[in-house]
Amino acid sequence: SKMASGVRRLPTPAERREIEDLVREEFIRQGVSASAVEKLKYHNLTAIDVNADGQAEMVGTFWAENSANERNLLFFIAEKNKSGKYAFDYSEYRKVTPDQVMSGDFTEVDKGVYHELLLDSLEYDGDQTAEIFTLVRGFEGNNFNVYSKRNGRWTRIFERSNYHCAY
């Protein structure tokens, strides 16, 4: 039986350019300024072949600094569509402002707090496609998510938090 390949690698330069174009388009669609989008930043972009089909899915965490008081976060799972181009199959955009930062230190967002980050991929439910495991760091704990390919779409199937009072 065919199993998830476990391939995990850096994207090629061509893959990175294609993904960055998608990310820029999404940020512009969300109202982020063109100048902020030009200075695109990221925490992670990983190529993972989740189903051993020879086509890498891309899991990424990008952000932009729209202003001194606004960060724009984007987590996504992208895969090639029928025309051979990458498209977001799952994406979540979030705008963060200083009033949402519990510590009062807005630079914590730039260091990864509130960003959804890839932990790993693992095939665990027998469907021959690896699930994607992520972490969202917070000030009073972390959120853990699992994504699975369901009915042809990436879907969050698990969400849990560990909580400890920090303030």
Where do the PLM segments sit?
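Beta-propeller-forming repeat regions
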Residues: S1-Y167
